[in-house]
């Protein structure tokens, strides 16, 4: 389409932005947005992010906060299990707490009716730990995430979960061995998108798409980063 844009003799330029590693945390676009915000003048008026929406006009998506947790236990023979600290079992308690948070949010909200899933979600993915059935596992690692609607702070949910580990689980673990406990690493933070249906770019895209409706999606895109930082 670039040659067609040039043929039109446009008074307002159209910028094409290409990024990499969107699927693993929107990594590539961050430096591009910083350059866009600081070096390109005049600043572009609006941004359209292409996603597979069947031409549905999307005005919002959830933000994503993802983390890896490492539970450090104390290895022992399973016949002496009370003398060890079972990293897998403490990880399971923490994961069960995350599930409890998910149930609470599903019941109490907050809610946004434009989403198919109208509330923030909490999810645990990959879990690894243990070496053999007759050995109390000394390590367990797992990844979890919060996908948040606008106005629901993913960082505060993460801090709530960490408090549970620090206040409820670690004291019991450290009674047996002081070196045991939980550590957390942030994997990625993808900002959510939340637009007013009356914004100029929304009206333009609806005209281009030939439709009047709009919606929000649960998956993340680079659009939230453009909205916040560009």
Would you name each region that the model predicts?
Residues 1-66:
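Acidic/histidine-rich catalytic neighborhood of metal-dependent amide-processing enzymes
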Residues 68-230:
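Metal-dependent amide/peptide-bond hydrolase catalytic core
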